[in-house]
Amino acid sequence: MQFSTFQKNLDNWQGASLIFGVLEEEIASQLENIKFIVDPKLLLKKVTQKKFKGEKGETLSFEFLDQKLETLIIVGLGKSKYLNKSDIENSIGNLIRKTVDKNEKISILLPWELINSQLEINQLAESARLSAYKDNRFNKKKDEKKVLKEIEFLNFKSFENICFEEAEKICEGVELARRLVAAPPNSLTPQEMSMQASQIAKDHGLEVKILEAKECEDLGMGAYLAVAKGSDLDPKFIHLTLKSEGPIKEKIAIVGKGLTFDSGGYNLKVGASQIEMMKYDMGGSAAVLGAAKALGAIKPKGLEIHFIVAACENMINGSAVHPGDVVKASNGKTIEINNTDAEGRLTLADALTYASDLKPDSIIDLATLTGAIVVALGNDVAGFWSNNDDLANDLKAASAQAGEELWRMPLQKAYKEGLKSHIADMKNTGPRAGGSITAALFLEEFFDTEIKWAHIDIAGTCWTDKNKGINPSGATGFGVKTLVQWIKNK
């Protein structure tokens, strides 16, 4: 799918479907903006008859028989003083999703004076494309409906030289993350994930290293391998490196939890634990690889970025880890496994140690780590923890720009008491209360504390059961846009 603009004489324009955004106030004057299609006075009469007021989310459609336009969809944006970028994106996204099966091209005309920067234009374009996303890979009968190929923006004023190339690259990263998360576990195995990473490296000139189980064993990754040994599928430890040409001003490591399926192990997931959905337990690694794809194409200056995923399954066989086992992570710390369904933090323990040994300036990890964060923040907001206020503020700002909401959670040191073990250095889970916090405190034990670090728990945000905003039902690709924006802001 591509983006385009039409900025010439609109009298010469024609199209199939036009989405036209209007504010709640002064509708009559705004209708003058589409006089190249229809008589504004006639349209105002019809709009008035339909009692359309331009309230947020309100829509009105008209069908035309002439050659200039087939369908006009007017969408209300509400009052200008209350309008924000997210409202515009969600309104346009909902409409695109409703019309995507009917058109190969959709045109959009908005009150551009409310868009404050080229960045916001690009983000609007991203939202439009991501709203139209469809995944029909596993359907027996291929979708015979039309496929949206182009989104066109009409009549820019302040953004005549707008370029959408970067927006397209970011969308490709989000779409990759969505495909990875949505793929069934018999399709997206650790092997397949490593192949996806290798393809990113090939396409965008990244360095790639895939560590096999023996190499991980040689590095002392006892926590990661304890999880992996319950599966008949070999684990794959993925390390991609994107290094800018010229002087490097900052080194960054981005780590993603990569459980391609999580049965819970011997603490088997039952009932409301949704074992059938545990294909998305690699949402963190999907975000990391999606960001790698986007940033590999964008090629930021002055940075060395490491993308790390410890991919494996958490399954049950004769070799699977038992509740009560003690394992040793690669930093030498011993862990009593009191719950085999808290496996993600075990894989991250060795992945974070590996990242720390690279001596980066900062480490970000993303993981579908706890159900507790979903209870705390729901499905629209991801919780994050950080040992550095500057990093936390930068991530929060980037997430706001990207339209992915983060909420900072406390690293409540007193809660570490709940991780104490009588036979090992620590347990892998604490008490039920504050479960997402103790999970973050556990991770904090596996990297050099001089390194700036943030942990983002996306358990509630990586999937949606229904259409919501710019996300069709299914995988959201949450985290890609925030990571890319954070890097771009440097």
UniProtKB/Swiss-Prot annotation:
UniProt keyword Ligase present: no
Ligand binding (Mn(2+) 2): K257, D262, D281, E343
Amino-acid positions noted as binding Mn(2+) 1 in the UniProt annotation, renumbered to this chain: D262, D341, E343
GO molecular function: manganese ion binding; metalloaminopeptidase activity
Cofactor notes: Binds 2 manganese ions per subunit.
GO biological process: proteolysis
Catalysed reaction, written as an equation: Release of an N-terminal amino acid, Xaa-|-Yaa-, in which Xaa is preferably Leu, but may be other amino acids including Pro although not Arg or Lys, and Yaa may be Pro. Amino acid amides and methyl esters are also readily hydrolyzed, but rates on arylamides are exceedingly low; Release of an N-terminal amino acid, preferentially leucine, but not glutamic or aspartic acids
Secretion signal span: none
EC number, UniProt record: 3.4.11.1, 3.4.11.10
Residue positions of the active site: K269, R345
Cofactor(s) the record lists: Mn(2+)
Gene3D superfamilies: Leucine Aminopeptidase, subunit E, domain 1 (3.40.220.10), Zn peptidases (3.40.630.10)
Subcellular location: Cytoplasm
GO CC annotations on file: cytoplasm
Keywords of the record: Aminopeptidase, Cytoplasm, Hydrolase, Manganese, Metal-binding, Protease
CDD domains on file: Peptidase_M17 (cd00433)
S-S pairs: none
Known function: Presumably involved in the processing and regular turnover of intracellular proteins. Catalyzes the removal of unsubstituted N-terminal amino acids from various peptides.
PANTHER family tied to this protein: CYTOSOL AMINOPEPTIDASE, LEUCINE AMINOPEPTIDASE-RELATED
Protein name as annotated: Probable cytosol aminopeptidase
Gene label: pepA
